[in-house]
């Protein structure tokens, strides 16, 4: 990935800011040249290096750029000569000083305006990058996150984006300004003395090769550094998520030691990165000063030998302009180094942005607004890894209004089967239909709008009770929310909190008990009032009393509604219309509780094991 391709991705929406920035940078550079040009007559007056002599030339008689530049110079000198004859050299010096101040003031104004228009470009590009990354992460299928470490994804969304901001966005102004300044200065140097400029250009490739070599090693080290940052964030996330287990097993010192190894390795990597990064300024300054020394030697020899086409004052002007290139060259070198650091982070971000979803939307989706008759699993097979099938040739019809329970040992494929219905994953073979329509031909948003989901682990947000219950449901009234909470046996404990439904429940509902969190999750599904319910171990976190109350409420809710229940506790699904027993990815038994008990097979053994 090149710098140009990176800019082409993000800059187009802000092209007018770029145009204005370039315009004011060009103006400021030209004003710098004019302010430098005032030095020539000053030197000539103060040190008698030459006489100020000029002949007035009407501009309408001028043809071509070269004649125009000569005419402007002659007219400027003619004006100075006239003022010297009228008022003397001291007045001309004062006039030149005032002109220098005015030109410098205008230059400073244009520099500020150039930066003024760069600010919305920088912040806008960064906002667009964050928005694109967040949208992509939200739209990716769940399967992506089973293969990627959560800490690594978080690192790319935080550390890598921050690195892009610090290294690429902060140097965009240099990237636009410095090449313009260097180009204008070089053109001016050619106009002043093309011989000296050609001599200088012969020496530049050596400097470019040295700076480029440092930059390439910097990018490789930056990639490694960001990967190590991701490992640190992963361990922090795992530690905070499993702190109860860490303390229970006295594993604090083990984790501390592992963390120390990580941060020490990261420190060493970033030591190398920053040491190379800080080479940019001294190396470019040393090379620039070396070039000036060579230039002084070469140009001085020409002037002393009377073989030069320029006089001493013009040579000093040439040196001043050339020295002015060193500043932009150093900044450009530093910006290039910074961008190489940022490119490493941008490539890590692109791995997410360029990830293709394996849950693909239909190009011409079919309209499904309600559930009418039947859900069908037809020869469905699925595997997270190709050599380890989770579901094999599953066939199942679920009629509208039925409650179907999926039971079996851990790893038998119960939850996976439930996850296929809302297209968290797509089966490798076979199909799932709703009312005869393949769910892959339905818009994912419309498909999931038909379903309510309550997971084994209650997923709550650091927000109020009200906002957690209404999550994904718009325009719900407080009475509707309270009614859903009552059905889920949650209204009483919510009303007992200080701010009732406006009480914040903490990160992932940390201020609530496990049973309370689950009941809030159930209330959310009840409020959505979908035609299809998916209950994945929905009552497993409840105490006996709460489970009984919520189970009764869920049974009332499930009446005349299609429900798929994933359960380990078989006592909660005895009243299901159909119980499917899964074993090693296949439905090995199906029927009601009484029918399955009479078969004396897998289901009966599971029931007897739990009753013991």
Which stretches of residues belong to each language-model region?
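An intracellular "coupling" helix at the cytosolic face of ABC transporter transmembrane type-1 domains
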Residues: 12-15, 142-143, 159-168, 172, ...
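Hydrophobic/aromatic residues within transmembrane alpha-helices of membrane transport systems
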Residues: 43, 102, 133, 137, ...
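Transmembrane helices of ABC transporter permease
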Residues: 17-27, 173-224, 297-310, 327
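Hydrophobic alpha-helical transmembrane bundles that constitute the permease/transmembrane domains
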Residues: 26-34, 101-112, 164-167, 171-183, ...
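Helix-loop-helix
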Residues: 188-202, 276-346
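ABC-type nucleotide-binding domain
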Residues: 361-362, 368-612
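Juxtamembrane helix-loop junctions of ABC transporter transmembrane domains
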Residues: 32-40, 48-51, 94, 99-150, ...
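Membrane-integrated ABC transporters
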Residues: 1-39, 45-100, 106, 114-118, ...
């Amino acid at each position: 990935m090149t710098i140009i391709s990176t800019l082409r991705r993000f800059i187009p929406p802000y092209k007018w800011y770029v145009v204005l920035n370039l315009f004011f940078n060009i103006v400021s550079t030209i004003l710098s040249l004019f302010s430098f040009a005032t030095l020539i007559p000053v030197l000539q007056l103060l040190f008698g290096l030459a006489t100020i002599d000029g002949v007035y030339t009407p501009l309408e008689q001028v043809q071509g750029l070269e004649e125009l530049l000569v005419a402007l110079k002659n007219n400027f000198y003619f004006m100075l000569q006239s003022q010297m004859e009228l008022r003397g050299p001291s007045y001309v010096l004062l006039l030149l000083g005032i002109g220098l101040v005015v030109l410098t003031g205008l230059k400073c104004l244009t520099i500020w305006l150039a930066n003024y228009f760069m600010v919305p470009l920088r912040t806008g590009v960064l906002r667009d990058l964050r928005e694109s990354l967040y949208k992509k992460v939200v739209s990716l299928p769940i399967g992506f996150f089973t293969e990627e470490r959560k800490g690594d994804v978080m690192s790319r969304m935080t550390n890598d984006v921050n690195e892009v901001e610090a290294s690429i966005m902060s140097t965009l102004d240099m990237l636009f300004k410095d090449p313009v300044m260097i180009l204008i200065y070089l053109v001016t140097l050619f106009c002043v003395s093309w011989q000296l400029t050609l001599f200088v250009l012969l020496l530049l490739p050596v400097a470019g090769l040295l700076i480029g070599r440092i930059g390439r090693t910097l990018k490789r080290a930056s990639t490694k550094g960001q990967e190590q940052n991701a490992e640190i964030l992963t361990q922090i996330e795992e530690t905070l998520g499993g702190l109860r287990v860490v303390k229970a097993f006295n594993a604090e010192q083990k984790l501390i030691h592992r963390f120390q190894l990580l941060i020490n390795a990261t420190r060493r990597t970033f030591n190398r990165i920053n040491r190379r990064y800080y080479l940019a300024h001294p190396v470019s300054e040393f090379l620039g000063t070396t070039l000036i020394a060579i230039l002084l030697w070469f140009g001085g020899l020409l002037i002393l030998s009377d073989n030069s086409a320029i006089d001493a004052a013009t040579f000093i002007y040439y040196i001043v302009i050339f020295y002015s290139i060193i500043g932009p060259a150093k900044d450009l070198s530093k910006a290039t180094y910074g961008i190489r650091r940022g490119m490493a982070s941008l490539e890590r971000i692109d791995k997410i942005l360029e990830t293709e979803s394996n849950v693909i939307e239909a190009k011409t989706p079919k309209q499904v607004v309600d559930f009418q008759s039947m859900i069908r699993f037809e020869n469905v097979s699925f595997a997270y890894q190709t050599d380890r099938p989770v579901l094999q040739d599953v066939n199942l019809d679920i009629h509208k209004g039925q409650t179907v329970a999926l039971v079996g040992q851990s790893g038998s494929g119960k939850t996976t089967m439930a996850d296929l219905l809302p297209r968290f994953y797509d089966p490798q073979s076979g199909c799932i239909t709703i009312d005869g329509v393949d769910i892959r031909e339905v818009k994912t948003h419309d498909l999931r709008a038909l379903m309510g989901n309550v997971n084994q682990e209650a997923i709550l947000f650091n927000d109020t009770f009200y906002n957690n219950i209404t999550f994904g449901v718009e325009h719900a009234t407080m009475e509707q929310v309270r009614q859903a909470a009552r059905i889920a046996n949650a209204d009483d404990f919510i009303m007992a909190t200080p701010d009732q439904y406006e009480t914040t429940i903490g990160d992932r509902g940390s201020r609530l008990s496990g049973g309370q969190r689950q009941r809030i999750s159930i209330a959310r599904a009840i409020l959505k009032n979908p035609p299809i319910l998916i209950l994945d171990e929905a009552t497993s976190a409840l105490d006996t009393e709460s489970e009984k109350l919520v189970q009764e409420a869920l049974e009332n809710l499930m009446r005349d509604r299609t429900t798929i229940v994933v359960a380990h506790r078989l006592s909660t699904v005895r009243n299901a219309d159909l119980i499917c027993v899964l074993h090693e990815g296949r439905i090995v038994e199906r029927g009601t509780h009484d029918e399955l008990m009479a078969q004396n097979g897998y289901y009966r053994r599971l029931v007897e094991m739990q009753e013991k």
